[in-house]
């Protein structure tokens, strides 16, 4: 359960920063100076990110599990579709598909058999996390500072780095920190889980598109 939620968090944060809406939200009244600085940093990062309803590309992931000497490596492709969610299509070492939508987290094997599935209707924590992180996909820049202490900086003309430290007790059950870096696209996500596991996801050849291609649309079915 905790590993699934952590996977959901990293996937949704990636989607939030990859396929965001063009609008922005003002910082709420009474926001502290620290939260205001975080909001301004997020706004600056979003201005550097490409604005597109669909982002697709390839990825590699290296996951280190506490107690195991060798990391687990996987690779494949991803699709982020505004209003639909995120799909991770793992191609190596074993084919599988991870779908993250506003209402569901589902892992499916190559033969169509469902490995596991979490639905927001049955898991209140999933609904809460979905609600928060998919709000970010709507460019509500007031959301992240409410749940994370945010540190970071702009790098050169296009680059940026962010570190997210959970303030919310629920998030802290699963996460220690998330580190992201990128330019016009998210390029790397580092996730440190509370139970000691960690993941590094590198995104390769991301491309912005106006609509889902037919093969990608089928991944959301």
Per-region residue spans from a language model:
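Flexible, surface-exposed loop/linker segments and immediately adjacent secondary-structure boundaries
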Residues: 113-160
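Gly/Pro-enriched, hydrophobic low-complexity segments
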Residues: 141-221
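N-terminal leader/targeting segments and the immediate start of mature chains
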Residues: 21-58, 64-69, 218-221
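Short hydrophobic/aromatic-rich beta-strand segments that constitute the beta-sheet cores
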Residues: 59, 80, 86-90, 105-107, ...
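Short, surface-exposed coil-to-beta transition loops
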Residues: 73-75, 101, 172-175
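Bacterial N-terminal signal peptides
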Residues: 7-16
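Positively charged n-region of N-terminal signal peptides that target proteins for export
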Residues: 1-4
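An acidic-aromatic
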Residues: 77-128, 199-200, 205
């Amino acid at each position: 359960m905790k590993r699934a939620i952590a996977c959901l968090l990293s996937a949704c944060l990636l989607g939030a920063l990859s396929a965001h809406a063009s609008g922005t939200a003002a910082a709420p009244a009474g926001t502290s100076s620290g939260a205001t600085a975080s909001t301004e940093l997020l706004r600056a990062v979003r201005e550097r990110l490409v604005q597109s309803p669909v982002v697709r590309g390839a990825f590699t992931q290296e996951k280190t599990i506490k107690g195991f000497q060798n990391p687990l490596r996987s690779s494949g492709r991803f699709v982020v579709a505004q209003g639909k969610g995120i799909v991770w299509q793992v191609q190596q070492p074993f084919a599988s598909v991870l779908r993250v939508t506003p209402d569901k987290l589902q892992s499916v094997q190559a033969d169509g058999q469902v490995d596991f599935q979490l639905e927001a209707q049955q898991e209140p924590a999933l609904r809460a996390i979905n609600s928060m992180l998919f709000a970010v996909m709507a460019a509500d820049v007031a959301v992240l500072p409410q749940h994370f202490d945010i540190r970071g900086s702009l790098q050169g003309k296009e680059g940026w780095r962010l570190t997210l430290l959970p303030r919310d007790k629920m998030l802290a059950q699963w996460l220690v920190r998330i580190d992201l870096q990128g330019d016009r696209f998210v390029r790397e996500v580092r996730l440190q889980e509370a139970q000691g596991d960690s993941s590094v996801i590198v995104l390769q050849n991301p491309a912005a598109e106006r609509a889902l291609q037919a093969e990608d649309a089928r991944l959301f079915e």
